């Protein structure tokens, strides 16, 4: 017996109107007037640790000559997963978040301009191979499967976690084994490591003699929290930092159930990209000069700090 995976896309005007709220209710998304109000009352932090970052010639010299000449890096960015990247003032306005700050700081160290294009999470990694983007950002976890086709330069340690509706009874304790999800409906993001994990482990419930879990996959963050609030899913699987941030927002009405599986998170590149060494050196420069720590403190993610950036580390086990 296998799980059933439903792929859902919510792109209605109502859902899109709620995206500013989601940005502040976290890695999931909202669909209530309460979340909209919360967004208006929760602006992004105003401190700017990136402002003081300057070009480091020895690091910039690691860039390929064509990138140095153009002075630009094309970044495919998945925006909408706070505290990583979101629109605090609504779509079409300037994005903010940990990933935005780190990418902008890296670009300044390298002496180039970050030309950012908002893209759906599941489209970014395939687009790297086609040359559409030089680098991808979107809280991409480093997994064994992804390392077959993509190169990574790490900048934080995050991973997989679960959250439920506050006061719900479907799941009350930290998930340490996916058999705890048997018989439940899980909502998660399209093209994510969460979707992959749930699909790869689809047989655990049958082996345990239990009813399989069902997975509903959403391309819009706005749909995930709405589904939880309306009782169409029992639990959300998403990023540790995102779900923790979400649960801290009263309007979200969620409870974070803790970490399930830690993952290094990195900038993503096409396999064999000549940009990886320059990015690694730039991240390490930011770690050494203290900018990195200030960015993470700003976004409340200091517990996810790394000591040094690595290229293509193995997946955590």
Model-derived regions, located:
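C-terminal motif of bacterial Sec signal peptides marking the signal peptidase cleavage site
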Residues: 21-26
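Extended ligand-binding regions for polar small-molecule ligands
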Residues: 28, 42-57, 100, 108-109, ...
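Extracytoplasmic small-molecule ligand-binding "clamshell" domains
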Residues: 36-137, 289
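Ligand-binding clefts/hinges and TM-proximal coupling segments of bilobed small-molecule sensing domains
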Residues: 49-63, 193-209, 255-256, 286-317
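Bilobed "Venus flytrap"/periplasmic-binding protein-like clamshell domains
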Residues: 82, 93-109, 140, 158-220, ...
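Acidic, polar ligand-binding/catalytic clefts
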Residues: 113-178
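A ligand-binding cleft/hinge motif common to bilobed small-molecule-binding domains
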Residues: 123, 140-147, 199-200, 227-261
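Periplasmic-binding protein-like
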Residues: 157-164, 244, 248-284, 302-317
């Amino acid at each position: 017996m296998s799980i059933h995976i439903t792929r859902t896309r919510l792109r209605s005007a109502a859902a899109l109107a709620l995206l500013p709220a989601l940005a502040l209710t976290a890695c999931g998304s909202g669909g209530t007037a309460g979340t909209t109000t919360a967004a208006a009352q929760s602006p992004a932090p105003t401190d700017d640790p990136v402002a003081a970052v300057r070009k480091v010639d020895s690091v910039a010299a690691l860039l390929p000559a064509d990138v140095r000449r153009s002075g630009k890096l094309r970044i495919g960015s998945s925006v909408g997963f706070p505290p990583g990247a979101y629109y605090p003032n609504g779509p079409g306005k300037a994005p903010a978040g940990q990933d935005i700050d780190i990418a902008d700081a890296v670009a300044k160290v390298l002496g180039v301009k970050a030309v950012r294009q908002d893209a759906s999470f599941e489209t970014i990694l395939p687009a790297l191979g086609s040359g559409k983007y030089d680098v991808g950002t979107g809280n991409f976890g480093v997994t064994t499967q992804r390392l077959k086709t993509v190169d990574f330069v790490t900048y934080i340690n995050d991973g997989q976690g679960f959250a439920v509706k506050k006061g719900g009874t479907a799941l009350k304790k930290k998930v340490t084994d996916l058999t705890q999800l048997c018989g439940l409906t899980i909502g998660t993001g399209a093209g994510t490591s969460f979707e992959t994990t749930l699909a790869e482990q689809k047989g655990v419930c049958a082996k345990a003699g239990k009813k399989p879990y069902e997975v509903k996959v959403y391309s819009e963050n706005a749909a995930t929290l709405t589904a939880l609030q309306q009782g169409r899913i029992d639990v959300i699987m998403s990023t540790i930092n995102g779900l923790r941030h979400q649960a801290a927002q009263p309007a979200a009405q969620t409870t974070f159930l803790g970490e399930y599986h830690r993952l290094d998170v990195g900038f993503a590149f096409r396999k064999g990209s000549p940009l990886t060494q320059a990015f690694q050196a730039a991240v390490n420069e930011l770690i050494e000069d203290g900018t990195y720590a200030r960015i993470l403190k700003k976004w409340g993610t200091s517990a996810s700090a790394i000591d040094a950036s690595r290229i293509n580390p193995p997946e955590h086990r």
